[in-house]
C-alpha cells in the first residue's frame, strides 16, 4: 500500500515583487509555489539573510521547470520573497 500525507499551506507575497519577478524570470509566484509539492525538492537556510530567517527551495514546478524559490516562514504562512 502507498500512502501520502498532504499538508495544507497558506502562501503570501508582495504583489509588486511578484510582478517584478514575473517580468524578470517569466514565472509568477502562483506557479512557483508548486515547488513545495515536489517530493524531491531541497530546502536550505539562506545564510545571507540578516533581517529574518529565510530559506532557499529548489524543486520542479508543475510544468517540470526547475525553480529556485526564496521564502520565509511567518506564523502559519509561507511568504515568497523571490
Predicted features by range, described:
Residues 1-82:
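Ribonuclease/tRNase effector modules and their secretory precursors
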Amino acid at each position: 500500500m502507498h500512502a501520502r500525507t498532504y499538508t495544507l499551506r497558506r502562501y503570501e507575497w508582495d504583489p509588486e515583487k511578484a510582478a517584478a519577478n514575473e517580468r524578470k524570470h517569466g514565472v509568477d509566484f502562483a506557479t512557483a509555489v508548486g515547488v513545495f509539492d515536489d517530493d524531491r525538492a531541497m530546502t536550505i537556510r539562506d545564510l545571507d539573510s540578516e533581517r529574518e530567517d529565510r530559506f532557499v527551495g529548489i524543486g520542479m514546478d508543475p510544468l517540470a521547470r526547475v525553480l529556485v524559490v526564496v521564502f520565509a516562514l511567518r506564523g502559519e504562512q509561507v511568504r515568497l520573497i523571490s
